[in-house]
Swiss-Prot record:
Source organism: Cupriavidus pinatubonensis (strain JMP 134 / LMG 1197) (Cupriavidus necator (strain JMP 134))
One GO term of the biological process aspect: glyoxylate cycle
GO cellular-component term (any): cytoplasm
Keywords: ATP-binding, Cytoplasm, Glyoxylate bypass, Hydrolase, Kinase, Nucleotide-binding, Protein phosphatase, Serine/threonine-protein kinase, Transferase, Tricarboxylic acid cycle
GO molecular function: [isocitrate dehydrogenase (NADP+)] kinase activity; AMP binding; ATP binding; phosphoprotein phosphatase activity; protein serine/threonine kinase activity
PANTHER family hit by this protein: ISOCITRATE DEHYDROGENASE KINASE_PHOSPHATASE (PTHR39559:SF1), PTHR39559
Taxonomic path: Bacteria, Pseudomonadati, Pseudomonadota, Betaproteobacteria, Burkholderiales
Gene designation: aceK
HAMAP family per the UniProt record, alphabetical: AceK
The name this protein goes by in its record: Isocitrate dehydrogenase kinase/phosphatase
Amino acid sequence: MSHFPKLLSSQIAFDVARTMLDGFDKHYRLFREVSRQAKVKFEAGDWHSLQQMQRDRIAFYNERVRETSVILEDEYDAENIEDEIWQQIKLHYIGLLTNHHQPELAETFFNSVCTRLLHRSYFNNDFIFVRPAISTEYIENEESPTRPTFRAYYPGSRQGMAECFERIVHNFQLETPFEDLRRDVGHVVRGVEEHFGDFRIAPNFQIHVLSSLFFRNKTAFIIGRIVNADRTYPLAIPIVHGPSGKLTLDAVLLKKVQVLILFSFTHSYFMVDMEIPSAYVTFLRDIMPRKPRAEIYTSLGLQKQGKNLFYRDFLHHLQHSSDKFISAPGIKGLVMLVFTLPSYPYVFKVIKDFYPAPKETTRELIKSKYQLVKQHDRVGRMADTLEYSNVAFPLSRFDEDLVRELEHHAPSMIEYQRGKDGGEEIVVRHVYIERRMTPLNIWLQEGTDEQLEHGIIEYGNAIKELIAANIFPGDMLYKNFGVTRHGRVVFYDYDEIEYFTDCNVRRVPQPRNEEEEMSGDIWYTVRPHDIFPETFRTFLLGNPRVREAFLRHHEDLFDPAMWQSHKDRLLAGHVHDFFAYPISERFINRYGTAAHGTPVASFARRVA
């Protein structure tokens, strides 16, 4: 039953609500400005600035939340505002959002500010937005009809497709000229015809394209859909810089699984200029219907909204399930305590209070490693994480062995409280949540020969792509990598991660005498950040089946020269080309267009 006041009588309540919305509006204005600048940097080929903008943007949200919280504390003594006034603040805020174009994001911002100011006993729908209050359906950009969420094009026939795609590209008004747009458009049309074969053109045949480009790494993506009769097909066209410095259309992606990988949790967030983000999410859900809205918001750079929606989905799942949280199967980690809910496809990771030898680390250092991954280009090889504080779980849903494990390994991270319904709850003070994957060591142990070979190929590619992106995993054991549902190998254990350019690539010195040669111990000096690729054989090639596949595909991983060549290119300022789609789909490989850009791996990337 609602306990909201019947009258909105407080001027302070309105002023606080207005201040909070002003804070959000400032945040989103800056967010959009970065997205607009991404187009300028892409046109100029200024990849280092693009990377820096991507990193900086991640901090925008928390900066505005802190800034707004300080204003409320200083000007309104927010922590001492009475409960009834806080309820009026929420109602005033809802009123201010009536015609807002980003109401769902503004509600999440309200929650973020409140959770900084209020005790967690206030984290219910009377005071914050546990459920959304404003609908995002059918929000239209009436102020700028020339910039709709998406544009519709009508080819009319197969013959009209070339002109249609040329108009699509021109409408993005890219300043950098194309190398040969007519040639590239011809490749797009040919790719469409080869994919669909002899399909009948329906009267409603049309192409819808989102009005903003999607920028990530060194690529700008055109994202759309093809509608014909009662079928809808995804469409993605990557635009890249050619060797001449001019632009080219690199491929046309028409398979649902190919578009899914573009929005995978293993990739960095896109930079997209969106007036109405909910409309973009609705469009993207149409071409990726099984993709959770939380993941789509996150991939668009709106990770706080994604985090909010994920938590709502999680609470909904808890309400409609009855299985218990258990300790995650597999080899126990030295730093993290990992648990899972079997019916839910995620794992929960809590930093332990104590770390046995040989681990030398701290809680703050581990958290900084996870933040590094959040800000860095994940190139499809590192899992994104959701970070939460003070999460309350029903104690009755926790397996007794798991509770004992938490009390033993992470006592400072848990506490108990009485829930609103009177039931006992266990509160986890800090937790990371990641998509659950099959640990690579288990995949290699239990897989067929074909699966094992695929796993080793993917593992080697993952290592090479990570170091090309300036990431050294630290602990390269197979147990620290997972296999996604589509068979891609992804790194997910970050407590020893570091920038590859901070590492010293070394060869193992020649032994100076027989005693050193026969020694079972390391007899040479090892300094911090030293890596010896030749020694990786010891812990990677123990299984004869693995050894055979590994040496067939990735023997160069044991060659210090390969590692040093990557480091030298990074130090020279080179930004590698990473393709979030199989390189076999590139027009240079399909139709023989002049080549440009060398992928890190020497064969087609698989979809994750």
